[in-house]
Amino acid sequence: MKKALYLLVVIVLSSCTNTDPNEQLQNLTGYWTIEKVEVENDSVVEYSLSQYIDYIEIKDSIGFRKKLQPKIDGGYIEASNDSEKITAKIEDDVLNLYYSTAFDEWQETVLVATEDELVIKNRDDKKYYYKKYEPLISTDEEETKE
């Protein structure tokens, strides 16, 4: 009985994460805000509110990541003119992102990518946890107040 219960728990938990790299790739494009960084297994840096968000756009496995600063009216200001080029590749049933700038090249692995959650592991084994960005004031709220 205990084995059956354990197996059921494992199946349920494993089905909760999105590990299909093709689905992960479809979920990458969007505005993401950092929640925390797992530096080591017992060391986590929490971000309650970040001044910047990441915008990721990928089409046909090619795209970019750009830092943006959200405005109160729902728009965005580019934090800089720089962006990181991204090439997405599915290798050994894992989604890898290859970044390049004028100064560096590196690779990160997507661990989870759903509509609302993104977890990426970098070359130093740090895990970055993102959630889908939601403006503090949405245009829907403003319309209902008027």
Show which residues each predicted segment covers.
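N-terminal glycine/threonine-rich, aromatic-flanked beta-hairpin/loop signature
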Residues: 45-90
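Edge beta-strand at a domain terminus
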Residues: 119-146
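Ser/Thr- and Asn-enriched, surface-exposed coil loops between beta-strands
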Residues: 112-116
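Hydrophobic residues embedded in beta-strands of well-ordered beta-sheets
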Residues: 62-64, 93-97, 117-118
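An anionic, turn-rich surface loop/hairpin at beta-sheet edges
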Residues: 77-111
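C-terminal motif of bacterial Sec signal peptides marking the signal peptidase cleavage site
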Residues: 12-15
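Sec-dependent signal peptide recognition
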Residues: 2-8
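N-terminal helix-cap/turn-to-beta initiation motif at the start of protein domains
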Residues: 19-33
